[in-house]
UniProtKB/Swiss-Prot annotation:
Name of the protein in question: Integrator complex subunit 9 homolog
Subunit structure of this chain's protein: Component of the Integrator complex. The core complex associates with protein phosphatase 2A subunits, to form the Integrator-PP2A (INTAC) complex.
Gene: ints9
Biased amino acid composition, Low complexity: 47-70
Positions of region (Disordered): 47-73
SUPFAM superfamilies, per database record: Metallo-hydrolase/oxidoreductase
Cell location: Nucleus; Cytoplasm
GO CC annotations, alphabetized: cytoplasm; INTAC complex; integrator complex; nucleus
Entry keywords, A to Z: Cytoplasm, Nucleus
Length: 712
């Protein structure tokens, strides 16, 4: 078994599992944080915006640059770099006027031929963003499996991203209408090499080292074609494919989010866990433990990015900040994804506003897919927790946002230009959480006021890199990541219950995650890095397969019970068991072993095959040896009698004998010499020590004829 890590980081999982000539791709997430390297649209920057004091020293003849000035040295040395990159407080950003957004895909270069990939298993809608790159831009022809909410909501989120990306691209074209020849030139290898030379020894040294492979986003038509190829499944539904059984179970993270069990015909069992939550108070179906119990191999990824910030604590701080901002007459902007933790927040915030006496404050949800997401959330009641399912059986919707809409406290808009008129103070949820694309960039400019707040709640984006381009903003910006995924302590508790024999984790989890079982034993832990390939030893001694129906009808089985008495197994005879042990059924089969769709099949041989089988037929011994019968057979053997051989028997201990046969050997010189054959005999084993091949064959035949079992 091999596991290839195509991921760029632990937060963008993509693994290739190779096992028994089957290749399974586990998730295909984009490294979405790469979007932070681009400047937001509709904002203008100068390289020296935040370095006026340093520029005043340019007239001095001091050539000793300090560390703060090193980050700006490329401006003086190479004006070409200044056309593509902007430096803000020592961090390089790609200018919003010279390029479209580029996206950091998994390391698909590790896969030589996508037609060899048998299937793709998707865990949730956050790990599906790279799927169109596979289905529409490679020769992939395999199967794709995901739960229905993952398919439907994932499609909405991808279409939303495409729309945001298109808006950014149009803005870049408008900003760069006089320099269209600069578009995407920053990815030129020579430009990046110059940048790396300038950044040696600095914080930005490796920032863009592999950015030459970043790609333009796919089109909406690609999403349509790609998602048509996905087969929707339900929790605990078994998929039997290529000799494997794949079963999804709830991970408790989001609508339809799943962990996967991949089992090889009852032998080795692989479990893949990504984006899981053990919380019982959230809206999704709770985490299911029993379906993923006792794995041989456990692949664990995408744990809580901020384990020191418990979700409940962050939620309390979020409400506190929202309350203080609203009481001062300010508006709260919350950049977020259009599905996920946001569904928890709508109801929680409405309840909080009522408690603090602010029920009149409206909550706005601005997204091109806002209404569709809210509709799906109500439709997929069977994918929700028990309390919300019970509401669905009543004449009520599972979520409260419909009630809030009727009260006028909650409103959904397609975008800020669709008759959106906010009544301040208010709370506005909109995308994108990176603050690089989407309506949030417009609203940040619109609400640039010290009484307003921008609260960043999504954990996927680094706070410093996110807010640096907005360093001139006077509104308050705070980072309150709400990450419901399991933290390291919960991961260790989960691992102790699952008791995996082999645990595979990203390298950054090495010091925090242990493979300690509930019984105190420790399992194997293997860490993996991007581009790594690890091999896992396969201890399986047998392989399951099928027998052709025609061949099966010709099989005549025989039974070996505990006492090894040979019995015929007929349709009218019932085989009894001894001491509650099942008897062993054995039979001789002559057939041809072949593989079809990764499944082994034994079929009847044709004429040419039959001739080959006769010549390569082997013998296999079953059962135990009858010491008494073997001794009698040796005594009655005519060859030993005719030669006058001496036969002696020594009982070493119970059921263990030494038989010594001495015979006269006449040489060419007519001198007689003794030839000794020693036979070590027990019910389970026989060793023949002799220099005479004729004697060895004779004794071997006697042993085979006196085996209390069945041999072929």
């Amino acid at each position: 078994m091999k596991v290839h890590c195509l991921s760029q980081s632990a937060q963008s999982p993509c693994f290739l599992l190779e096992y028994k000539n089957v290749k399974i791709l586990l998730d295909c997430a984009l490294e979405i944080s790469s979007i932070l390297h681009f400047l937001p649209k509709n904002l203008n920057y100068n390289n020296n915006n935040n370095n006026n004091n340093n520029n005043n020293n340019n007239n001095n003849n001091n050539n000793n640059n300090n560390n703060n000035n090193n980050s700006y040295s490329f401006k003086e040395k190479d004006k070409e770099l200044n056309q593509f990159f902007k430096n803000i407080n020592g961090t390089l950003y790609i200018d919003n006027g010279c390029s479209n957004i580029k996206y950091n895909c998994p390391q698909f270069e590790m896969i030589d031929d996508f037609s060899t990939i048998d299937m793709i298993l998707i865990s949730n809608y956050t790990n599906i963003y790279a799927l169109p790159f596979i289905t529409e831009y490679t020769n992939f022809q395999g199967k794709i499996y995901a739960t229905e909410p993952t398919v439907q909501i994932g499609k909405l989120l991808l279409e939303e991203l495409v729309q945001m990306d298109k808006q950014y691209s149009n803005s870049s074209i408008n900003n760069n209408n006089n320099n269209n020849n600069l578009s995407d030139c920053w990815q030129n290898i020579e430009i990046l090499e110059k940048l790396n030379v300038h950044n040696v020894g600095m914080e930005n040294e490796n920032l863009y080292r592999d950015s030459y492979r970043w790609k333009d986003l796919y089109k909406k038509i690609d999403i349509e074609k790609s998602f048509e190829k996905i087969q929707s499944i339900r929790f605990n539904e078994s998929i039997k494919h290529y000799g494997f059984e794949c079963i999804p179970s709830s991970s408790g993270y989001g609508l339809g989010s799943a962990n996967w069990v991949i089992e090889s015909k009852g032998f080795e069992r692989v479990v893949y866990i990504s984006d899981s939550s053990l919380s019982l108070s959230r809206y999704p179906t709770p985490f299911q433990l029993s379906p993923i119990d006792n794995p041989d191999v456990l692949i664990l990824s995408k744990i809580n990015h901020y384990p020191n910030n418990p979700p409940d604590q962050m939620l309390s701080e979020l409400c506190s900040n929202i309350g203080s901002t609203l009481q001062q007459g300010g508006t709260v902007l919350i950049p977020s994804y259009s599905c996920g933790i946001i569904l928890d927040l709508f109801e929680h915030l409405a309840d909080y506003l009522n408690k603090v006496g602010l029920p009149y404050v409206p909550i706005y949800f601005v997204s091109s897919v806002s209404k569709a997401v809210l509709s799906y959330a109500d439709i997929y009641s069977e994918w929700l927790n028990k309390s919300k399912q019970e509401r669905a059986f009543m004449p009520e919707t599972p979520f409260l946002h419909q009630d809030l809409m009727r009260k006028g406290q909650f409103q959904a808009y397609q975008h800020v230009h669709s008759n959106f008129q906010a009544n301040d103070p208010c709370i506005i949820f909109t995308g994108h959480p990176s603050c690089r694309i989407g309506d949030i960039t417009t609203l940040i400019k619109l609400y640039d006021n010290p009484k307003n707040s921008i609260l960043l709640i999504e954990p996927d984006f680094d706070f410093k890199s996110t807010v640096l381009p907005f360093s001139k903003q006077i509104s308050r910006i705070q980072f309150l990541p709400i990450d419901p995924r399991i933290n390291f302590n919960e991961a260790n508790l989960l691992i102790s219950k699952l008791s995996p024999k082999h645990l595979i984790i990203p390298r950054i989890y090495k010091n925090y995650v242990k493979n300690k079982h509930s019984n105190g034993n420790f399992g194997i832990v293997t860490t993996i890095l991007p581009l790594d390939t690890i091999k896992i030893q396969n201890n399986q001694n047998f392989e399951s397969g099928f027998i052709d129906k025609e061949l099966a009808q010709t099989i005549q089985t025989k039974v070996l019970d505990k006492s090894s008495q040979l019995k015929n197994n007929t349709t009218t005879t019932t085989t009894t068991t001894i001491n509650n042990q099942q008897p062993i059924h054995v039979a001789e089969i002559s057939g041809v072993l072949s593989m079809s769709d990764h499944e082994l099949i034994i079929s009847p041989p044709n004429i040419s095959d039959s001739n080959k089988i006769i010549h390569i037929k082997e013998k296999f011994i079953w059962g135990t040896l009858s010491i008494e019968n073997i001794i009698k057979a040796i005594n009655s053997t005519k060859q030993f009698k005719n030669n006058g051989d001496s036969i002696e028997y020594f009982e070493i201990n119970e059921n263990y004998y030494l038989i010594k046969i001495s015979s006269k050997n006449k040489t060419n010189n007519n001198n007689n010499s003794d030839q000794v054959t020693n036979i070590h005999l027990s019910p389970q084993n026989v060793n023949i020590e002799t220099s005479c091949e004729t004697t060895r064959r004779l004794i071997s035949d006697i042993v085979l004829l006196n085996c209390n079992g069945f041999y072929v």
